[in-house]
A protein has these predicted regions:
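His/Asp/Glu-enriched, well-ordered alpha-helical/loop segment
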Residues: 220-234, 253-340
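Active-site core of metal-dependent hydrolases
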Residues: 145-269
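Active-site gating loops and adjacent loop-to-helix segments of metal-dependent hydrolytic enzymes
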Residues: 49, 72-84, 88, 124-150, ...
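N-terminal metal-binding scaffold of metallo-dependent hydrolase/deaminase domains
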Residues: 1-33, 349-351
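Conserved, mostly hydrophobic/aromatic
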Residues: 43, 117, 169, 199, ...
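Divalent metal-dependent hydrolysis catalytic cores, especially in the metallo-beta-lactamase
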Residues: 55-58, 68-95, 110-124, 148-158, ...
Length: 352
């Protein structure tokens, strides 16, 4: 089956007036020359679907309760690829159920690419919520791996046993991530050398080791991560820049470049109150109420161009989890296409 769309196309480095042809779910042509066959005019901008590698919920349900509900809600708002994310406070037996449910949901919800485990091997001081079983248990984590759905798995690199854990999961094809941490440079470097390639929501739930010399600062966790040459960096981009100040995002981009920054939702809210896009439990900041469509709009309002935005909301997250045929309008890639307006506001799904 073949279909061609005509409109303004958001590419990796530019926007062109042209055509995108989809053949059997794969992009078969991108260019300015008119192809044969019926043409479907798109009023707005043709862009790759959003890719969210860190999403726990939607306003209707948590992924641990109903992965199908979460997937459907975010698909309707342009997220064509996502990782259902499970936090460290889920007990062992319940987490096994979550992974089984994810595997089943993937059969009928094609925007679920797999699971992201945010824990349980997390420094308790820098993790919100509860949970005490934070030392890696190989017997347990081997059972999680057996489901074959984990794509990204986060731990705190200062926790005992995590160097071996990171090495094990990297060998199994999972992308190790690090976060919720006060790790030293040496601990971050060890994690990186063992395979860690994603920094979980950089600048959030992190710290620095105690200073050795009065009046000076040690290298903090975030700075250590930014020194790793092939690391990707999650950033929560809410409207008022509560999680990450705009200037910190500018700093990150200046240091590491735009090609390794991944905008995420870290959505962790269930309920009717959508007056703000951040989520508080008591006085503690606990994730967001974001969709990736909201993230894209927030980035536009902060001054980023459409090609820059779609690197951060589609291409870079895909590359971070080794999904190399996604996140960019290019021949041979999955034809997951959306329409946005000139201000990056999501309009509709075009092809999925």
């Amino acid at each position: 089956m073949q279909k061609t769309y005509k409109g303004k196309i958001v590419l990796k480095e530019s926007v062109i007036d042209g055509y995108v042809t989809v053949t059997d779910g794969v992009i078969s042509y991108v260019g300015t020359e008119k192809p044969d066959g019926e043409i479907f005019e798109v009023a707005g901008y043709i862009a790759p679907g959003f890719v969210d590698i860190h999403c726990h919920s939607c306003p209707l349900a948590h992924a641990k309760v109903s992965p199908e509900t979460v997937a459907k809600y975010h698909l309707e708002r342009g997220t064509t690829t996502m990782l259902l994310t499970y936090y460290r406070d889920i007990p062992h037996e319940r987490l096994l159920e979550c992974l089984a449910n994810t595997k089943k949901a993937m059969e009928t919800n094609k925007n679920i690419y797999g699971a992201h485990l945010e824990g349980p091997y997390v420094n308790p001081k820098y993790g919100c919520g509860t949970g005490t079983d934070y030392i890696p248990n190989k017997a347990n984590y081997d059972k999680y791996i057996e489901f074959g759905v984990i794509r990204q798995w986060m731990c705190s690199p200062e926790v005992e046993g995590t160097p071996e854990f990171i090495s094990d999961i990297a060998k199994s094809g999972i992308v190790p991530a690090i976060g919720h941490s006060v790790a030293s440079y040496e601990q971050v470097k060890t994690a990186y050398d063992n395979g860690a390639r994603i920094t979980t929501h950089i600048f959030d739930a992190t710290g620095a080791p105690p200073t050795k010399y009065g009046g000076t600062l040690e290298v903090n966790f975030n700075e250590s991560c930014m020194l790793m040459p092939e690391m990707y960096y999650e950033v929560i981009c809410d409207r008022n820049w509560v999680h990450v100040r705009k200037e910190k995002l500018q700093f990150l981009l200046k240091v590491v470049g735009i090609d390794r920054v991944c905008a995420i939702t870290d959505a962790y809210y269930v309920g009717e109150d959508t007056s703000d896009d951040v989520n508080f439990v008591g006085t503690s900041l606990t994730g967001s109420k974001l969709t990736m469509a909201m993230v894209a709009r927030n980035l536009f309002n902060a001054g980023y161009t459409l090609p820059e935005i779609f690197k951060m909301v589609a291409l870079n997250p895909s590359k971070a989890i080794k999904l190399m045929d996604c996140g960019e309008i290019a021949v041979g890639n999955q034809a997951k296409l959306i329409e946005v307006d000139e201000s990056a506001n999501f309009k509709t799904l075009l092809n999925f």
